[in-house]
């Protein structure tokens, strides 16, 4: 109900509402030169606002306004599968070649142990190679590397070269304050490219005024010219422009595992886990950084829930949060090794309820992966396998009743149309991998 929204408080969009027997999500698309749009309740109305530029702004020359759009759907499956916000953005320039853009899984050190140390990098690349993952992210801290006469750039090139020798490419974290102008963007990213990186994670971006929204476009053009994959962090929400710039594989603009972290005394409310797939994810991929297994960071969630996050929260460049120590030799190492990050088909399971439970079927080629994340209340859900073509080998990961940092694993044969019933703990989850055998 509108009355549950605090009056005068700016809301990030898409904003999703249940209307009658259907759903409406309100958002914006193709925002390049306007300030980012917020929404605010005034009485019984929802109005547009501009939190970053409340006094307005002056435009000289051409004015390019974004689209204000409403996605209307009969059910959550129709809502999630809408391409409206993306299709309202211009297609990529046909003269531009994006064949070099490669999605993949990313190992990452900062969440589990903060600033990466120069002398520790080889073991992380070794672990990424053992997992069969495509990338390793060198996060904040590399700027202070030094060894003998080598400065940070020489140290960076050394570890990137080591990663290449193991078949693992590198994505590099940078602070946006290093490149505020177009010339600074080019010069700084040229150094990153020269060091051998194939991608960039740009952090601490200022509030989304019209000037900063134009800065995003400059960054996208420069990363394209240098053939660097792009991930914006600490940033504005997406507005569908991945259609224009396919090398922007993901961006943050979401409360993911960097919010849910004990060293900052922050815990993700469980209902939010089942809200974001039907709000923020409608605008584009989210760098949620899923799948923490270390027991001290579960904070009420379960291992199956954490694994399911990587299926429910889509990101063509998926940075897995935890240390490799919790992935290698885990009961689901094979699933982590094989899990796709791009999908050919998505089905929202009918038992899904915004804020309570989210269940997704994702197809990649001939395989189906099912992920379920549960909210604050234990529940039992059922779904059928009518999407299968015949029989399949199912690998099932479910909650263990007595422990968060554990799971139940089962291998079985299932058939098309079979009904599956799942008991979910509070903060629990469920994963099923299906491989055709007919």
Residue ranges: model-predicted function:
Residues 63-135:
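An acidic-aromatic substrate-binding cleft motif
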């Amino acid at each position: 109900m509108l009355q549950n929204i605090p009056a005068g408080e700016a809301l990030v969009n898409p904003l999703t509402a249940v209307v009658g027997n259907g759903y409406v999500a309100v958002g914006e698309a193709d925002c390049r030169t306007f300030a980012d749009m917020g929404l605010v309740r005034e009485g019984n109305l929802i109005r547009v606002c501009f939190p970053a530029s409340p006094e307005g702004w002056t435009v000289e020359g051409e004015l390019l306004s974004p689209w204000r759009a409403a996605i209307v759907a009969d059910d959550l499956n129709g809502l999630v599968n809408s391409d409206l916000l993306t299709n309202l953005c211009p297609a990529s320039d046909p003269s531009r070649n994006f064949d070099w853009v490669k999605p993949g899984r990313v190992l990452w050190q900062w969440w589990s142990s903060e600033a990466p140390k120069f002398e520790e990098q080889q073991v992380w690349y070794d672990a990424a190679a053992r997992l069969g993952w495509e990338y390793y992210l060198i996060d904040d801290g590399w700027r202070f590397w030094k060894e003998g006469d080598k400065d940070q750039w020489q140290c960076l090139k050394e570890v990137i070269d080591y990663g290449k020798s193991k078949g693992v490419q590198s994505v590099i974290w940078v602070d946006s304050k290093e490149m505020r102008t177009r010339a600074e963007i080019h010069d700084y990213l040229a150094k990153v490219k020269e060091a051998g990186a194939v991608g960039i994670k740009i952090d601490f971006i200022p509030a989304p005024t019209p000037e900063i929204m134009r800065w995003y476009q400059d960054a996208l053009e420069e990363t394209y010219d240098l053939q660097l994959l792009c991930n914006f962090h600490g940033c504005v929400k997406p507005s569908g422009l991945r259609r224009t710039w396919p090398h922007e594989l993901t961006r943050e603009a979401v409360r993911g595992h960097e919010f849910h972290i004990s060293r900052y005394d922050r815990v993700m409310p469980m209902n939010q886990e089942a809200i974001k797939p039907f709000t923020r994810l409608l605008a584009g991929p989210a760098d949620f950084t899923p799948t923490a297994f270390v027991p001290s960071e579960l904070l009420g969630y379960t291992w199956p829930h954490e694994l399911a996050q990587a299926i429910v929260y889509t990101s063509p460049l998926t940075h897995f949060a935890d240390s490799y120590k919790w992935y290698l030799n885990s009961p689901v190492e094979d699933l982590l090794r094989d899990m796709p990050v791009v999908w050919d088909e998505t089905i929202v399971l009918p038992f899904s309820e915004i804020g309570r439970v989210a269940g997704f079927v994702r197809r990649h080629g001939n395989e189906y992966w099912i992920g379920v994340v549960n909210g604050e209340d234990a529940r039992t859900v059922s779904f059928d396998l009518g999407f299968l073509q015949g029989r399949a080998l199912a690998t099932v990961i479910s909650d263990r009743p007595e422990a968060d940092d554990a799971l139940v694993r089962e291998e079985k044969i299932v058939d098309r149309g079979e009904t599956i019933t799942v008991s979910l703990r509070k903060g629990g989850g469920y994963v099923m991998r299906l491989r055709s055998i007919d």
